[in-house]
C-alpha cells in the first residue's frame, strides 16, 4: 500500500484538478492531505472529496512543508510514503508500478523525472537541468514525488524542521543508506506559479540551488523560495 501525502497551503486553484487526477490512478493507496492553515477554500475542496472517497483523509498541522509532511507520515498506513506537491500530477500507472516494487527489498526509495505543463522552452530547460542534477546526485526534490519506505523514512527522522530545502536535507541522509531509483516517466507540475514568478527567475533559482547543493554554499534566503499563488 502507498500513502500519498499532499501538503497544502492556499491551494484552492490547484487541488480541484490534482485530486481527481490522482484518484483516477489504479492501485492500492490512500491520500492524506495535510493543510497548514489555508485561508482559502483548500480545506473545503479536500473535505468534499474525502466525503465521497474513503481513500482520502484531511489532516491539519502547523504551517511548514516539513512539519506538514511529517504529520502526514505519522498517520500513514502504507509500506510506501510518497510526497506529492498540490500542483503536481503523477504519470499514468505510477502507483501500480510502485505497488509492484513493494516486494523488492533492493528498492528503498526513489522519485520521478520532472516536467512542466505547457510547452515553454525555458521551462523545459529548467526541467532538463533539474533532471540532470538528480540523476547525477540522487538528491530528489520535493516536486519529483519522492517516495520512500515508511520504516526507512521514520528511521532517518523524517524531514528536518527547516523552512526551505527540507527535501535536499532529507535526501542527503537518504543517499548514505540507500540508492534511490529515478523513474523516467515524468511528473508534471503546473507551470502557472513559475510563469507568474517569472521564468528566468525560476531558472536562476534552479541554478542557485544546484550551486548550494554541489558546493555546500550557505542556504539561500527564504524569500527567494516564496510561493506565488
Q: What is each of the regions a protein language model found here?
A:
Residues 20-29:
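Short, acidic, metal-binding catalytic loop of nucleotide-sugar glycosyltransferases
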Residues 21, 35-44, 88:
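A conserved acidic beta->alpha catalytic loop
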Residues 41, 86-100, 172:
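Acidic donor-binding/catalytic loop of UDP-sugar-dependent glycosyltransferases
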Residues 81:
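Short aromatic/hydrophobic "clamp" motif used to bind/position activated sugar donors
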Residues 93-122:
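Conserved donor NDP-sugar-binding/catalytic core segment of glycosyltransferases
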Amino acid at each position: 500500500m502507498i500513502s500519498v501525502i499532499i501538503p497544502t497551503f492556499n491551494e484552492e486553484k490547484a487541488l480541484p484538478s490534482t485530486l481527481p487526477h490522482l484518484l483516477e490512478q489504479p492501485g492500492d493507496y490512500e491520500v492524506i492531505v495535510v493543510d497548514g492553515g489555508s485561508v482559502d477554500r483548500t480545506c473545503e475542496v479536500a473535505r468534499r472529496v474525502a466525503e465521497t472517497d474513503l481513500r482520502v483523509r484531511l489532516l491539519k498541522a502547523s504551517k511548514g512543508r516539513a512539519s506538514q509532511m511529517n504529520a502526514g507520515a505519522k498517520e500513514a498506513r502504507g509500506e510506501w510514503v510518497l510526497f506529492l506537491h498540490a500542483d503536481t500530477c503523477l504519470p499514468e500507472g505510477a502507483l501500480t508500478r510502485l505497488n509492484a516494487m513493494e516486494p523488492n527489498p533492493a528498492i528503498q526509495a526513489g522519485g520521478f523525472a520532472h516536467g512542466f505543463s505547457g510547452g515553454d522552452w525555458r521551462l523545459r530547460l529548467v526541467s532538463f537541468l533539474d533532471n540532470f542534477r538528480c540523476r547525477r546526485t540522487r538528491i530528489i526534490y520535493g516536486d519529483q514525488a519522492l517516495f520512500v519506505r515508511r520504516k526507512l523514512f521514520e528511521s532517518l527522522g523524517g524531514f528536518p524542521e527547516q523552512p526551505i530545502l527540507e527535501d535536499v536535507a532529507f535526501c542527503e541522509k537518504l543517499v548514505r543508506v540507500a540508492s534511490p531509483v529515478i523513474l523516467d516517466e515524468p511528473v508534471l507540475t503546473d507551470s502557472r506559479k513559475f510563469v507568474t514568478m517569472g521564468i528566468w527567475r525560476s531558472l536562476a533559482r534552479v541554478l542557485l540551488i544546484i550551486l548550494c547543493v554541489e558546493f555546500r554554499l550557505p542556504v539561500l534566503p527564504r524569500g527567494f523560495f516564496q510561493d506565488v499563488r
